[in-house]
Amino acid sequence: MGNRAEEDYNFVFKVVLIGESGVGKTNLLSRFTRNEFSHDSRTTIGVEFSTRTVMLGTAAIKAQIWDTAGLERYRAITSAYYRGAVGALLVFDLTKHQTYAVVERWLKELYDHAEATIVVMLVGNKSDLSQSREVPTEEARMFAENNGLLFLETSALDSTNVELAFETVLKEIFAKVSKQRQNNARTNAVTLGSGPAGQELGPGEKRACCISL
């Protein structure tokens, strides 16, 4: 359990990490949620998630970050992993081109199981190993642009762009949710007493629903 401040939030956003084994998904998760990095390359089997609450304007957003934790090795990721996700970081290792070559397959699997409105960022991890780079920045950037994805290069080791990557995705999700709520208000779609999932909480309320975009 986090401290009281950690428990006070307006929205919960589920964000999934996907990509090949060994690209640094778990370290991106631990760097963002706990500011930790592990040099131990052993893979833990089983789905896990961590949370961190961030402020976007006056709204407290609880980011629930899910990690496949090795299941991708066995093609054992199920639809339950993607269910309810409103954001995804599709991670590849920019020092191993083979992890980038299968990005399109991961994107297809994501769209097969997740909502079409999910916010997706392509992440080239391990930017600290620039001398070993196998994937040009512009190649990955163009792929992202052509597929409507956000794009950043990160280093979980030295923290470069890790905060920015997660916060950019969360801001994009929040913008979509805010726009959806405005549209609902315009069309009188919100019924008193039975607001939609992910409804913003009033003063003093601390519980929240997961968002569906």
UniProtKB/Swiss-Prot annotation:
Interacts (GTP-bound form) with RAB11FIP1, RAB11FIP2, RAB11FIP3 and RAB11FIP4. Interacts (via the hypervariable C-terminal region) with ITGB1 (via the cytoplasmic region); the interaction is GTP-dependent. Interacts with ITGAV. Associates with the integrin alpha-V/beta-1 heterodimer. Interacts with VPS33B. SUPFAM superfamilies: P-loop containing nucleoside triphosphate hydrolases. A motif (Switch 1) lies at residues 35-49. Its main location: membrane. It is a lipid-anchor. It is found in: Cell membrane; Cell projection, Pseudopodium membrane; Cytoplasmic vesicle. It is an enzyme of class 3 (hydrolase). Switch 1, switch 2 and the interswitch regions are characteristic of Rab GTPases and mediate the interactions with Rab downstream effectors. The switch regions undergo conformational changes upon nucleotide binding which drive interaction with specific sets of effector proteins, with most effectors only binding to GTP-bound Rab. This is Ras-related protein Rab-25. The small GTPases Rab are key regulators of intracellular membrane trafficking, from the formation of transport vesicles to their fusion with membranes. Rabs cycle between an inactive GDP-bound form and an active GTP-bound form that is able to recruit to membranes different set of downstream effectors directly responsible for vesicle formation, movement, tethering and fusion. RAB25 regulates epithelial cell differentiation, proliferation and survival, thereby playing key roles in tumorigenesis. Mg(2+) binds at residues 26, 44, 67. It catalyses: GTP + H2O = GDP + phosphate + H(+). Residues 211-213 form a propeptide. Its cofactor is Mg(2+). Belongs to the small GTPase superfamily. Rab family. It comes from Bos taurus (Bovine).
